[in-house]
């Protein structure tokens, strides 16, 4: 069993979870079943990933009374998509996720991004020129609607994803249910030290997405640095008899940062949770800390006039224009 962090709600959140972004239907069900069989007790989902129905099939077969895993031992996260920020749309969006996942409640529900897209069922509403159609709903209004889900017992904890420090404080200024978790891209090239400190001072735990550098994403640039080929990481892997991925994950869990590596390959799913039986010295941690160069891999891109441009960078609530 992976060790945990304790949320301010009293919930235990396992430090390693299975990520499901880019896990295709047809593959994700077997991946979840295998992950549960080798001790994973944390699954990270999102409505926009388009695979919650199949994840739900895996959960129905393996979780609950008389099944391999009791429901109360499993920590399931999902995320509210940008088209569902309007307060009138929030509960219905959650209920669809619960129905798809075949669950009665979520352990954690995150606002996926701070800004809202145009309301409706097309997840990426676009103008004729390829740019996104936005909605003016502010995340503080969305947060109030999310709080009602906790009161109804549909969600145990709320959190944020891709919010910067200023936006987190903005939520805290209006929250009666305080966010418990911030989920952001985080790895040695983007260590997020300031943001993590900011969260810890305010009672939020941090989850790292793309903790291995997300080399399989669509808008990858051919000459960008490859985290899994970083010499410092390879040297530590050789020294400890571990894989490069295990080195990257151990660094995070030793910092008490939750990780959600995505894999559909059984050998890698198993490897990714085997990071609790070795430890880095302070010097080894410093070697990995020194790799930080504020390199962000995950910036959603769109094609406008034949050019690839950041999808949302012009939006006033875009989170990544701030230092952290």
From Swiss-Prot:
Keywords: Acetylation, Cell membrane, Cytoplasm, Lipid metabolism, Membrane, NADP, Oxidoreductase, Phosphoprotein. NADP(+) binds at residues 10-21, 44, 161-162, 210, 212, 214-215, 262-265, 268, 271-272. The modification N6-succinyllysine is found at residues 126, 144. GO terms for cellular component: apical plasma membrane; cytosol; synapse. Its EC number is 1.1.1.2, 1.1.1.372, 1.1.1.54, 1.1.1.19. The active site is at 49 (proton donor). The modification N6-acetyllysine is found at residue 126. PROSITE patterns: ALDOKETO_REDUCTASE_1, ALDOKETO_REDUCTASE_2, ALDOKETO_REDUCTASE_3. The modification Phosphoserine is found at residues 3, 37, 210. It is an enzyme of class 1 (oxidoreductase). GO terms for biological process: aldehyde catabolic process; cellular detoxification of aldehyde; D-glucuronate catabolic process to D-xylulose 5-phosphate; daunorubicin metabolic process; doxorubicin metabolic process; L-ascorbic acid biosynthetic process; lipid metabolic process. The keyword DNA-binding does not apply. Pfam families: Aldo_ket_red. The keyword Cytoplasm applies. It catalyses: a primary alcohol + NADP(+) = an aldehyde + NADPH + H(+); L-gulonate + NADP(+) = aldehydo-D-glucuronate + NADPH + H(+); L-gulono-1,4-lactone + NADP(+) = D-glucurono-3,6-lactone + NADPH + H(+); allyl alcohol + NADP(+) = acrolein + NADPH + H(+). PANTHER family: ALDO/KETO REDUCTASE. Catalyzes the NADPH-dependent reduction of a wide variety of carbonyl-containing compounds to their corresponding alcohols. Displays enzymatic activity towards endogenous metabolites such as aromatic and aliphatic aldehydes, ketones, monosaccharides and bile acids, with a preference for negatively charged substrates, such as glucuronate and succinic semialdehyde. Plays an important role by catalyzing the reduction of D-glucuronic acid and D-glucurono-gamma-lactone. Functions as a detoxifiying enzyme by reducing a range of toxic aldehydes. Belongs to the aldo/keto reductase family. This is Aldo-keto reductase family 1 member A1.
